[in-house]
């Protein structure tokens, strides 16, 4: 290895190490603080909890965090399932017909235009519309998530199919007597596994951690709050008592971290191939 390459690798490792430390320190402080009393947090912010206490988590359970956790779980699971059921099929149809029919190119271009529209531009009209339609509830929030998930998810699936799923598979299946639905269900859909994992993680992270849409749609009815919305109001309730707030953050982190660890091996392949058109 040349001297210049060694220097480049050295600085890359330095930057990665520094970046890792900057990410891990706040996470470590959050975990430690969730097991401390507030006076210990104030006096020994970076120290390991001594003694370890579960009082913050007990108070969190007593304050009904389970209900808000359930709300977030239902919204996230239903939204992800619908996205992964319909968008891959739409992407397959578009990817296979873009080169043959101009209408599919136009349709695809219109659908992915949403990527370039900032949410802040349509935030107020969307809120007013959902309220007037009587959809200022969990079902309305799911509909909005599905709508906003279409552009990015469709873009990734179409790119992945065009790059990694050759047309010859369709032709071979047709020769064997399979119709389009059978071809998609038994051949194409299983081959999209890396992209399924990628879109699952991307959308689940967004749906689970999103704060702005629940604030706009669900804030009037506390029984429908999601976990991030509960954390926001909970932090305000315990403004001078940091322990329960830190515990609520850990509850939100653990679930999505587990999902990420399960599917992480497929994410890089899905992102790298799906981003290439």
Curated annotation (Swiss-Prot):
Subcellular location: Cell membrane
Superkingdom of the source species: Bacteria
PROSITE patterns: ABC_TM1 (PS50928)
Keywords, in A-Z order: Cell membrane, Membrane, Sugar transport, Transmembrane, Transmembrane helix, Transport
CDD domains: TM_PBP2
Bridged cysteine pairs (disulfide): none
Membrane topology of the entry: Multi-pass membrane protein
Function comment: Involved in a binding protein-dependent transport system responsible for the uptake of melibiose, raffinose and isomaltotriose.
Protein source organism: Streptococcus mutans serotype c (strain ATCC 700610 / UA159)
Secretion signal, residue range per the UniProt entry: none
Domain ABC transmembrane type-1: 69-263
UniProt KW ATP-binding keyword: no
Protein's UniProt keywords contain Transmembrane helix: yes
Protein name in UniProt: Multiple sugar-binding transport system permease protein MsmG
Any GO BP: transmembrane transport
Transmembrane segments annotated in the record for this chain: 13-33, 74-94, 110-130, 141-161, 198-218, 243-263
Record family assignment: Belongs to the binding-protein-dependent transport system permease family. MalFG subfamily.
Gene Ontology cellular component annotations, sorted alphabetically: plasma membrane
């Amino acid at each position: 290895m040349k001297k210049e390459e060694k220097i480049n690798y050295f600085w890359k490792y330095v930057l990665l190490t520094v970046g890792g430390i900057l990410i891990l320190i706040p996470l470590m402080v959050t975990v430690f603080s969730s097991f401390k009393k507030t006076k210990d947090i104030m006096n020994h912010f970076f120290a390991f909890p001594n003694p370890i206490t579960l009082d913050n988590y007990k108070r969190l359970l007593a304050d009904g965090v389970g209900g808000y956790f359930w709300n977030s779980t239902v919204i996230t699971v239903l939204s992800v399932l619908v996205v992964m059921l319909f968008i891959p099929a739409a992407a397959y149809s578009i990817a296979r017909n873009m080169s043959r029919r101009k209408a599919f190119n136009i349709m695809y271009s219109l659908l992915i235009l949403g990527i370039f529209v900032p949410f802040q531009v349509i935030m107020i009209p969307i809120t007013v519309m959902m309220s007037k339609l009587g959809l200022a509830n969990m079902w309305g929030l799911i509909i909005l998530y599905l709508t906003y998930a279409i552009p990015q998810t469709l873009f990734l699936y179409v790119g992945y199919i065009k790059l990694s799923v050759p047309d010859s598979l369709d032709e071979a299946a047709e020769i064997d007597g399979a119709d389009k639905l059978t071809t998609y269900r038994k051949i194409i859909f299983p081959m999209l596994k890396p992209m399924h994992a990628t879109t699952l993680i991307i959308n689940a992270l967004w749906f689970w951690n999103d704060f702005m849409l629940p604030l706009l749609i669900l804030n009037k009815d506390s029984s429908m709050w999601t976990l991030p919305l509960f954390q926001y109001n909970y932090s305000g309730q315990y403004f001078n008592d940091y322990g329960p707030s830190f515990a609520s953050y850990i509850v939100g982190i653990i679930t999505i971290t587990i999902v990420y660890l399960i599917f992480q091996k497929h994410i890089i392949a899905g992102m790298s191939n799906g981003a290439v058109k």
